[in-house]
From Swiss-Prot:
Coiled coil: none annotated. It comes from Pyropia yezoensis (Susabi-nori). The gene is tsf. NCBIfam families: tsf. The keyword Chloroplast applies. Its main location: plastid. Belongs to the EF-Ts family. GO terms for cellular component: chloroplast; mitochondrion. The lineage of its organism: Eukaryota, Rhodophyta, Bangiophyceae, Bangiales, Bangiaceae. GO terms for molecular function: translation elongation factor activity. It holds the Pfam family EF_TS. This is Elongation factor Ts, chloroplastic. Associates with the EF-Tu.GDP complex and induces the exchange of GDP to GTP. It remains bound to the aminoacyl-tRNA.EF-Tu.GTP complex up to the GTP hydrolysis stage on the ribosome. It comes from the Eukaryota. It is found in: Plastid, Chloroplast.
Amino acid sequence: MTLQISAQVVKALRDKTGAGMMDCKKALQANNGNEEKALESLRQKGLASANKKSNRTAIEGLLESYIHTGGRIGVLVEVNCETDFVARRPEFQKLAKDIAMQIAASPNVEYVSTQDIPSEIINLEQRVEAGKDDLKNKPVDRIETIIEGRMKKRLKELSLLDQMFIRNQDISIEDLINQNIAVLGENIKIRRFVRFLLGGGEENLKVNFADEVADILNKK
């Protein structure tokens, strides 16, 4: 006998993952109604689909821009897919807009992924961490472990794909892209981006800009 899952539970899982209603229902039924296990299975399904398509050429897509209210911060991002047909799909266009707004709200992000971070930047960050006062008088093996953990965290701060999606803190931007790969059936890549800030540094802003962008996203 097939396990009956309420529409409310299915919708809650869809809101968390972005997967289709039927996919969410099947995942819940396959996992005896356990939402966490169903969520994990959907993520694995999206990742498997993404891995199958990751080597396929993605040269279509669009350039998406976002200018925040007041013109203080602007973003231009190139998001690629395989065909012009998918580039015109509302789901793909929404993804590109969400990514642009994510970049606007992420002042520390400088690269698409950790693999894009130049070795000289990594070496510089390692020297900075190694020179911090709180590491003095600690055993050498302990210092290496601390630096490794801090470096992993720091490199993720610089990587767009490792950021938690401001509209859904349960998934990363990489998860978001993988979900859309599963839905749209094509390889999707963030090719490059640039973030502009009027007048210089973030310290000149008098508001929590990430919260502002999150509010705008959640109202859409």
